[in-house]
């Protein structure tokens, strides 16, 4: 399709940053190393949470999963994120991509599905944190002490996010290094005890494929979430591809080394491989001191995961407000810290309400909604190559459209498995949320037409925007 033939909606999306909005321009704060660790915490945060893959399918399939899955999922998703984030470096992220490809309805659906999956994912981290803490403090296993701990941790960590992305970025560096250090010690101490034949075990005959695939997916996805922070990055065209490359390698190594070490050194009943088992394995390998160290690392990792995911969700809401998909007040920033406090508050409150769900249902629901969003993302990526071939892309995936189709079809097959193996409660939760996302689009249009809320209006001409020039946002009602 020729660029001049691209259809235009009534409020075509631009790529906006703080500089192109009505806000006072501020210096971008994310440089390479903090961005690498934010991506790392968007995706992984360490080997915490990989244990159920062994419980579901045995050591061999767990190892193969973490070896192969990055090639069929993580790398393609990271490549797409690198190309589109550098072509459209704004806080709208994947919302911009979907809208530019297919229009406002698809852009709105993409934003809603990814936001809902994001806040559900945020809800899982206080739960994971308390799951490790209750091994040190059994009183947190259930009842009101556990609920109070989840509530308090959510409030405190949300306030940390409010203090600024620069603080969150550098905190992620420290949290990442400290939380990984006990695993390096454990892996080194496990070497004399490793028996390689244990790696070939298939475990029990009955496999829990739902748990297996959801564990792999949950531990190795969300690479594109960092796209909602693109407007806050120094030189995103250069920084994003390099940061994603480093993060992919770093994340895969962080999963595989402890997995090889523990499955090779420890022989236990497969049912014991549940969330938190790495801490028990550390005690078997080196003693209680290492178990405590890993549990402390798990808490720190959960903090990093929470901060990174909450940042993405909050800045996504700000980006959608900048682009006219949400009322302007969603993009309000703090006068003290220049952070999108409304986005942080809404994301934190929603995640708090969801954090009392069953942990497995939390993961499965986040994966299901994310899967629906990824189908839209793959389609948007390919269609933008066809629709806007002359668009300036500082980083371009080195494939033509047929190759891109194949690259996207392989992970799409895995997405189908996620949908097929979902449970009834997950279908129910995600069905209601998807219907709600459709209704939200029409409700927002009603608000815009009746001027109940104030929206940004964006005037964009794709014919004059193929070289990466980003039109301004008119700061008035649409």
Curated annotation (Swiss-Prot):
GO MF annotations in UniProt: polyamine transmembrane transporter activity; symporter activity
Transmembrane segments: 30-50, 60-80, 113-133, 143-162, 165-185, 211-230, 242-262, 285-305, 336-356, 362-382, 401-421, 425-445
Disulfide bonds: none
Keyword tags: Cell membrane, Membrane, Symport, Transmembrane, Transmembrane helix, Transport
A Pfam family per the record: AA_permease_2
Topological type in the membrane: Multi-pass membrane protein
Any one annotated GO CC term: plasma membrane
Subcellular location field: Cell membrane
Record flagged with keyword Membrane: yes
Family matches, as Gene3D superfamilies: Amino acid/polyamine transporter I
UniProt record, GO biological process: polyamine transport
Family statement: Belongs to the amino acid-polyamine-organocation (APC) superfamily. Polyamine:cation symporter (PHS) (TC 2.A.3.12) family.
Function, in words: Probable cell membrane polyamine/proton symporter involved in the polyamine uptake in cells.
Record PANTHER family: CATIONIC AMINO ACID TRANSPORTER, POLYAMINE TRANSPORTER PUT1
Protein name, per record: Probable polyamine transporter At3g13620
Native organism: Arabidopsis thaliana
Lineage: Eukaryota, Viridiplantae, Streptophyta, Embryophyta, Tracheophyta
């Amino acid at each position: 399709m020729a660029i001049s033939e691209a259809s235009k909606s009534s409020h075509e999306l631009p790529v906006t940053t703080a500089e192109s909005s009505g806000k006072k321009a501020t210096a971008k704060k994310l440089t390479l190393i903090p961005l690498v660790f934010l991506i790392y915490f968007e995706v992984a945060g360490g080997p915490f949470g990989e244990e159920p893959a062994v419980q579901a399918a045995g050591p061999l399939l767990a190892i193969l999963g973490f070896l192969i899955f990055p090639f069929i999922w993580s790398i393609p998703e990271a490549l797409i994120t690198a190309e589109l984030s550098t072509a459209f470096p704004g806080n709208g992220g994947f919302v911009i991509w979907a809208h530019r490809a297919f229009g406002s309805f698809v852009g709105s659906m993409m934003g809603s599905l990814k936001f809902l999956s994001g806040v559900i994912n945020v809800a899982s981290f206080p739960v994971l944190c308390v799951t490790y803490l209750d091994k040190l403090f059994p009183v947190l296993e259930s009842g009101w002490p556990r609920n109070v701990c989840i509530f308090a941790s959510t409030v405190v960590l949300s306030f940390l996010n409010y203090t600024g992305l620069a603080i969150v970025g550098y905190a992620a560096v420290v949290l990442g290094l400290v939380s990984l250090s006990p695993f390096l010690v454990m892996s080194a101490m496990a070497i004399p005890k490793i028996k390689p034949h244990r790696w070939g075990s298939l475990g029990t005959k009955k496999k829990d494929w739902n748990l297996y695939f959801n564990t792999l997916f949950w531990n190795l996805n969300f690479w594109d979430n960092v796209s909602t922070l693109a407007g806050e990055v120094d030189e995103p065209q250069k920084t994003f591809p390099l940061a994603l490359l480093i993060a992919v390698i770093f994340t895969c190594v962080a999963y595989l080394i402890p997995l090889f070490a523990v499955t090779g050194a420890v022989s236990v009943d497969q049912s014991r491989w549940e969330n938190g088992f790495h801490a028990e394995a550390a005690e078997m390998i080196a003693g209680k001191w290492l178990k405590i160290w890993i549990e402390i690392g798990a808490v720190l990792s959960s903090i990093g995961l929470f901060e990174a995911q909450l940042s993405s969700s909050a800045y996504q809401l700000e980006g959608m407000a900048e682009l006219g998909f949400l009322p302007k007040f969603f993009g309000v920033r703090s006068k003290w810290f220049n952070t999108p406090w409304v986005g942080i508050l809404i994301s934190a409150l929603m995640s708090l309400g969801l954090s009392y769900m069953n942990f497995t249902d939390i993961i499965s629901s986040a994966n299901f909604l994310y899967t629906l969003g990824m189908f839209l993302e793959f389609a948007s990526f390919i269609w933008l190559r066809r629709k806007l071939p002359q668009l300036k892309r500082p980083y371009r995936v080195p494939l033509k459209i047929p190759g891109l189709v194949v690259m996207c079809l392989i992970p799409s097959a895995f997405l189908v498995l996620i949908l097929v193996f979902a449970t009834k409660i997950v279908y129910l939760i995600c069905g209601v949320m998807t219907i709600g996302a459709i209704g939200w689009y029409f409700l927002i249009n009603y608000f815009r037409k009746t001027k109940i809320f104030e929206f940004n209006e964006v005037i964009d001409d794709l014919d004059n925007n193929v070289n990466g020039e980003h039109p301004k946002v008119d700061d008035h009602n649409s």
